[in-house]
């Protein structure tokens, strides 16, 4: 049955018309996952040069650009009786004052104080009766700087589309570019509960007809359908094998609603040098650094890491070029082993690189993407139950998300963005996660931890710094493996 469903989705996923105001199955799942102490918003803490703009001036700059992201004036409307996925509707009471906020750091205005502020902001759940985002302007940062803290619900945006959205708020030159004028915004009347329910029931009734039209297309293109079916079967088997429970760890404990936030700065050129000297990719280097830091942290807290291999969920974007700039989530993921047992930094990186290479060939991400698309066809009650079941099962120990950002300076109202640190949500019984983002030659780590379960989060941040230094020092002495000879030997063995 499982294989049949995945196969059907593979060949029909482009056949059914999508209501652009209806949340996708994955976006809906993020709302279902937001229960108890688990908040499902993403964010970032940014540091800018120069004095902060006046609040009214800053708010005006945001107001002038809102027509470019109309979703930011919409709220989630749930379907009565759970008869459909939620939809986006205009908020007739939209008030920019509520979403764009202003605060000041107390003297001396240290970066530590900014991180504390960001953690407190991140600890509060977004109000679902309003558009799901907040933007905090924090002035008074030392050395003539100011901060910006963003908070947006995961149902609205993913990491890659967030970078596209930044182009709406930021300029690529110090001199602000002219903003195209938008029409005066008049919200559509909010639909009644009966209207929302009726629309959802009509969509559910017409969906079988849409699928039937997709089935007819299989008859017209049997070869393409056969290829898709083979890929789906392969991906389904790989994903099933990856779904085994992750090992127990001190990071998988009950959490509360409050958060801590720590950051680490790294140099992109240094990480590139490491991967050039040892092999692999920059993402492999990042995962090896996380594995080394986590292993050192656990040993420092008295835990044995002998033979311990944790599992990280590594989100990847499946957003196409045509979808860049669109809001909503287009992500899949790998379940990547973290060799925290390994004391040798070079062996650790090569182990990560080899396993990630195997995962990419295994089509695990394809299987996860297909199951994600299953939620677009499944009844909403099943989607909600599946999301809650996933939150109860320990499929991974922590999240490590690495988002490539722009490699040239960005500006906000003429002020240069100096650094950005991502903030990733904690799922149920997930006490820590790693968000990594590259920007303008930097690679910055944002560590989010549960306030009670991770009282030593800053220590884990120092372990990340140590793991980078350890790997950087060892890399020049490493002998890069000869891939061509290995590939030739592999081909000879097949002959």
Language-model features, listed with the residues they occupy:
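Soluble acyl-CoA-dependent acyltransferase catalytic core bearing the H(X)4D motif
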Residues: 2-26, 34-39, 43-430, 434-465, ...
């Amino acid at each position: 049955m499982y294989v049949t469903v995945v196969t059907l989705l593979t060949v029909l996923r482009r056949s059914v018309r999508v209501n652009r105001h209806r949340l996708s199955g994955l976006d809906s799942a993020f709302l279902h996952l937001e229960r108890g102490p688990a908040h499902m918003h993403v964010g970032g803490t940014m540091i800018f040069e120069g004095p902060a703009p006046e609040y009214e001036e800053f708010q005006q700059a945001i107001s002038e650009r809102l027509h470019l992201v109309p979703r930011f004036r919409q709220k989630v409307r749930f379907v009565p009786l759970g008869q459909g996925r939620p939809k986006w509707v205009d908020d007739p009471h939209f008030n920019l004052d509520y979403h764009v906020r202003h605060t000041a750091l107390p003297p001396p205005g240290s970066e530590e104080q900014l991180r504390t502020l960001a953690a407190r902001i991140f600890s509060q759940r977004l109000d679902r009766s309003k558009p799901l985002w907040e933007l905090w302007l924090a002035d008074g940062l030392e050395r003539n700087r100011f901060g910006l803290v963003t908070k947006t619900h995961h149902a609205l945006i993913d990491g890659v589309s967030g970078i596209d959205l930044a182009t709406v708020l930021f300029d690529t030159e110090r001199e602000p570019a002219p903003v195209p004028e938008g029409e005066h915004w008049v919200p559509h009347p909010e639909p009644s509960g009966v209207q929302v329910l009726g629309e959802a029931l009509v969509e559910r009734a017409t969906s079988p007809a849409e699928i039937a039209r997709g089935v007819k297309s299989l008859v017209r293109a049997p070869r393409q359908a056969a290829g898709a079916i083979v890929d789906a079967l392969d991906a389904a088997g790989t994903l099933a094998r990856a779904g085994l429970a992750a090992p127990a760890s001190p990071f998988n404990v009950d959490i509360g609603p409050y958060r801590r936030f720590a950051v680490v700065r790294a140099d992109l050129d240094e990480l590139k040098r490491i991967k050039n000297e040892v092999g692999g990719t920059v993402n492999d280097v990042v995962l090896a650094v996380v594995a080394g830091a986590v292993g050192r942290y656990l040993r420092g807290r008295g835990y044995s890491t002998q033979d311990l291999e944790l599992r990280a969920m590594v989100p990847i974007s499946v957003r196409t070029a045509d979808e860049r700039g669109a809001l909503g989530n287009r992500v899949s993921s790998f379940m990547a082993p973290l060799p925290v047992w390994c004391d040798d930094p070079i062996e650790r990186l090569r182990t990560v690189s080899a396993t990630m290479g195997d995962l990419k060939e295994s089509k695990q991400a394809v299987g996860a993407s297909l199951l994600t698309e299953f939620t677009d066809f499944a009844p909403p009650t099943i989607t909600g139950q599946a999301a809650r079941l996933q939150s109860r099962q320990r499929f991974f120990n922590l999240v490590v998300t690495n988002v490539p950002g722009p490699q040239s300076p960005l500006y906000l109202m003429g002020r240069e963005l100096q650094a950005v640190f991502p903030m990733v949500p904690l799922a149920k019984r997930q006490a820590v996660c790693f968000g990594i983002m590259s920007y303008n030659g930097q690679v910055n780590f944002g560590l989010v931890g549960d306030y009670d379960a991770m009282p030593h989060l800053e220590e884990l941040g120092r372990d990340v710094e140590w793991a980078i230094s350890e790997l950087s020092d060892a890399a020049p002495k490493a002998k890069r493996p000869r891939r061509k000879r290995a590939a030739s030997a592999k081909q000879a063995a097949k002959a």
